[in-house]
């Protein structure tokens, strides 16, 4: 496996074939303390960069048609877990207990990663959109910091980002809302999550990802017959 193959295959989207064996270097499980609180959206946006510098993980949910944000920060701790563990809120537990989120209500979701330095302005535009054109939306908007990586086609390639996620109930119409949000995300150089809703063409994807051509070159070299391309990826490559 060549080095450029490895770099591309870390985000392979199922298009590089089946992985039959992998050797992983792991770390020991560790304990995390989660702290949650409510604040106004303006206060939260104003303090968000400081919160990110002070905590390992930082995110919040804003509830449309209100000024309320539910903030969540997570840090490593030496404190002992306390059971029964609350589903969310202020709690201490093992990493595999605290990091996952329980989401029992079915919904659709669009998530874009926006450069960290532009994310607050983007969020304000999303807020204005909801206040003006989509007042019926009750699902919260999620705002979460994420560090840069070096993975080809990653939404966080080469830069720190904030992921902004919008949601709608599974039985509700989502396309007008999501398309309006996507227009805003793209105006802030956003990149879509590969596993969630987007409406982009292959040409648009290529303009967003500087490693697009090299990723496809590696993919096509590994699978020239295109056996592992699904309908969605074929639509992007045509």
Protein language model regions, located:
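Flexible loop/turn segments at secondary-structure boundaries
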Residues: 26, 66-70, 120-121, 148-153, ...
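Generic recognition of stable, solvent-exposed alpha-helical segments in well-folded globular domains
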Residues: 43, 117-121, 125, 173-176, ...
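Activity-critical C-terminal alpha-helical subdomain
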Residues: 191-238
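Short glycine/threonine-rich loop-to-helix capping motif typified by GTGT followed
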Residues: 72-80, 147-159, 203-212
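Generic non-transmembrane alpha-helical segments
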Residues: 122-134, 180-188, 214
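C-terminal hydrophobic structural anchor segments
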Residues: 140-198
